[in-house]
């Protein structure tokens, strides 16, 4: 089960594929692979554990497409992401979707939308959270095996991880150490803590929300 977001255009299906591939290739976290059935633009950011895929297929993958407003035409392109990602990671991908929609005049659709809609970040995030809840109900054992960290805490930590390399580059002449947080779990309480390893011979930047 994945969260899927489908892309449409209004009134026509024209799309310059060279420009689309250039858009994907410009992103340093994306690699493009082609098979006989589809083109996959795979987004992978190891720093925050973010994996996502844009698929360009030969046939439509939109469920119940017949019930949608016919003025919107399916482009056979969709985004697929894990249904239980941290919301910070979801926001990173949705920001990329925003750029995609703005550049190519795309509209978006998810099975929880009433119809195809213009890009609205809050609409996509809300539908993702609903899919997350449905996934939790459908696969309770998988959910209970997860470790819980408060949303504001994990968002701040992931934001730091996402920006860490840029921070290092900006401060390269100051000999600052930017540690990578690790998560440890108390065997007694089950609570998860964020900790870092420090170097004795360097000044360091203390990451946000570390315990």
Features from the language model and the residues they span:
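Short, extreme N-terminal segment that most often corresponds to the first beta-strand
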Residues: 1-49, 147-162
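A structural detector for beta-sheet-dominated domains
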Residues: 8-10, 44, 57, 82, ...
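Structural alpha-beta junctions
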Residues: 26-32, 98-109
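Short, solvent-exposed beta-alpha or beta-beta edge segments that form flexible loop/patches at the rim
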Residues: 38-73
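Generic recognition of long tandem-repeat/solenoid scaffolds
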Residues: 39-43, 73-81, 203-205
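Elongated alpha-helical scaffolds
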Residues: 73-81, 85-102
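Short proline/glycine- and acidic-rich turn/helix-capping motifs at secondary-structure junctions
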Residues: 111-122
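Aromatic/basic-lined ligand-recognition segments
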Residues: 123-211
């Amino acid at each position: 089960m994945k969260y899927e977001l489908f892309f449409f255009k209004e009134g026509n299906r024209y799309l310059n594929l060279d420009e689309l591939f250039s858009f994907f290739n410009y992103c340093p976290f994306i690699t493009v692979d082609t098979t006989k059935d589809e083109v996959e633009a795979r987004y992978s950011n190891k720093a925050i554990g973010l994996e996502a895929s844009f698929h360009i297929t030969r046939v439509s993958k939109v469920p119940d497409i017949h019930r949608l407003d016919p003025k919107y035409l399916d482009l056979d392109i969709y985004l697929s992401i894990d249904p239980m990602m941290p919301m910070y990671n979801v926001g990173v991908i949705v920001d990329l979707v925003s750029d995609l929609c703005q550049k190519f005049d795309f509209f978006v659709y998810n099975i929880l939308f009433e119809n195809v809609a213009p890009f609205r970040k809050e609409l996509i995030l809300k539908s993702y959270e609903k899919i997350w809840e449905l996934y939790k109900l459908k696969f309770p054992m998988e959910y209970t095996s997860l470790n819980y960290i408060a949303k504001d805490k994990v968002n701040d930590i992931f934001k730091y991880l996402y920006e860490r390399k840029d921070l290092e580059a900006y401060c390269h002449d100051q000999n600052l150490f930017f540690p990578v947080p690790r998560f440890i779990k108390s065997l007694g309480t089950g609570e998860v803590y964020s900790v870092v390893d420090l170097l004795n011979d360097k000044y360091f930047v203390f990451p946000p929300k570390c315990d």
